[in-house]
């Protein structure tokens, strides 16, 4: 229920436990209600989540998925049973990037200011797809590791 999920989202102990559980996260990413309840909190538990996502019995990993095209808005994997973990951002010095969780396309999970080259990313978690927006010019993207629930 959404009430139960809201209670979990309000507890750091509960959030840490579910983020670290491949079984829980597999079920959550298949539920729109559950994702909406935790979308604003899950990025704080990225390290626990990445450990859980390594469970190949529950998730399939696709590494190096590029999303974004300069100053365009690009959606990827919206409404799919996925978790997107941003790992890097490439820019040629003239575009700012934002990524939003696919569950609502409004919860900002990452902001990267314009830079030259590839910058490592160590924050952010998107649930049920991702939206990437660029502000500026024509080149750039965010690279994600995408985990799909089996």
What does each model-found stretch correspond to?
Residues 111-125, 130-132:
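Noncatalytic accessory or regulatory domains flanking protease catalytic cores in secreted, cell-surface
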Residues 47-50, 54-105, 110, 131-138, ...:
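Beta-rich globular "head" domains
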Residues 9, 14, 19, 24, ...:
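N-terminal targeting/docking segments
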């Amino acid at each position: 229920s959404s009430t139960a999920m809201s209670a979990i989202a309000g507890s750091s102990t509960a959030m840490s436990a579910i983020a670290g559980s491949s079984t829980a996260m597999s079920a959550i990413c298949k539920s729109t209600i559950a994702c909406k309840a935790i979308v604003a909190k899950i990025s704080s538990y990225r390290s626990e989540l990445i450990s859980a996502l390594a469970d190949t019995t529950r998730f399939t990993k696709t590494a190096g998925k590029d999303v974004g095209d300069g100053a365009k808005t690009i959606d990827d994997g919206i409404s799919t049973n996925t978790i997107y973990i941003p790992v890097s951002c490439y820019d040629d010095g003239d575009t700012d990037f934002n990524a939003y969780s696919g569950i609502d396309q409004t919860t900002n999970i990452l902001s990267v200011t314009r830079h030259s080259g590839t910058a490592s990313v160590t924050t952010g978690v998107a649930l049920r797809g991702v939206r990437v927006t660029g502000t500026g010019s024509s080149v750039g993207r965010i690279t994600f590791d995408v985990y799909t629930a089996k």
